[in-house]
Amino acid sequence: MLKQRSEKVYDLASLAQTEKFAKLSPDFTTIWNYRREILDHLFNEGQGQFSTLQGKLEVIKNELMMLVKQVMASPKSYSIWEHRVWTITLGLKLEREFIAAMKAKKLAEKAEEEKKQHDAA
């Protein structure tokens, strides 16, 4: 796992491995840091489920669900709580982007409708 991190292997398989290792050793901060690096990379690459805001929000939701299980198993693990804060912060940022995109879409639709009405008159 550490070799993968040093080689900057940021893929879904590595993400799955970090989850397994985190369950075995929730206080191993390096695993959580690597997990954040993987998620950052996947979000920035924007492929597959990471290509849309809705997909990214779904990933965040799944990450939070995984973290609930981790917190229940190890409620005093600082590393888990730190990752949870990071995940929530990222989720809020993405949610703001999603809301802004939806508002922009509605404004564009309204402007298009007004243009059609104006052209018809």
Each model region followed by its residue ranges:
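Generic preference for flexible, low-structure residues
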Residues: 45-47, 94-96, 115
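Internal amphipathic alpha-helical repeat/solenoid segments
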Residues: 1-79, 91
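Long all-alpha helical scaffold domains
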Residues: 64-69, 74-112, 120-121
